[in-house]
Amino acid sequence: MKWVRNQLEKVEVKKKEITPCATVFIPDTTFFGGTYGVCVFRALLLKKNLWWTEVSKEIMVTYYYGRKILEDKGWVFTAVVVDGRRGMTTVFKDIPVQICHFHQMKTVTKYLTRRPETLAGQELRRIMLELPRSNEEEFTKLLSEWKKDWNEYIHEKTYITGTRRWYYTYKKVRSAYLSLERNLPYLFTYQKYPELNIPNTTNSLDGSFAHLKDKVNIHHGLRRDRRFKMIEEILGGEED
């Protein structure tokens, strides 16, 4: 470990100069523990990470900042693929935005589980599983039919005895549906712009993050500045 630390002290991280071009970007943030993370912008066309910065939490201003830096250098954002975090569609509201199908399905599963107990949940999960092989018209129809059948159900309220306070009786099913409804305009962007070759997942950057964590976690005792040097070396040198 001491040898590794000494080597990192000697390393001067130099970012490779790449000629700016028009490309689809995948911006996202990954964390190493609760309050230390790295926000990364990956160029899909080049399969390279072009910009990154340390963060203590995921906030939209970081994405605004990263986008501006890249555009000031001459990079053109033709579209982005995001994980669905609220606020991301606003950062990139002037270009096509695709929400990752994997993350959308993960969100719905978080609310419904893999084996929903209610009939409403079971039917909604079946609709969700159609996402990767559906299109906007078909998926919208399926969601609309589900809402028509279960609208009263997801609006049912339970009142707390002796108070005026209440909560939605089937809150998790409701949340799963609202997530799909809210993100629907961004779930089939990749089909609307075939010429841009937009993927429907963030797999390219997810794979980069997995590789990064495998490497960094081996040296978990590193001081913060040394750890970031290692992160920069890995992010800047990766191509797959």
Predicted regions and their residues:
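Core catalytic machinery and nucleic-acid-binding channels of phosphodiester-processing enzymes
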Residues: M1-N6, I95-C100, H219
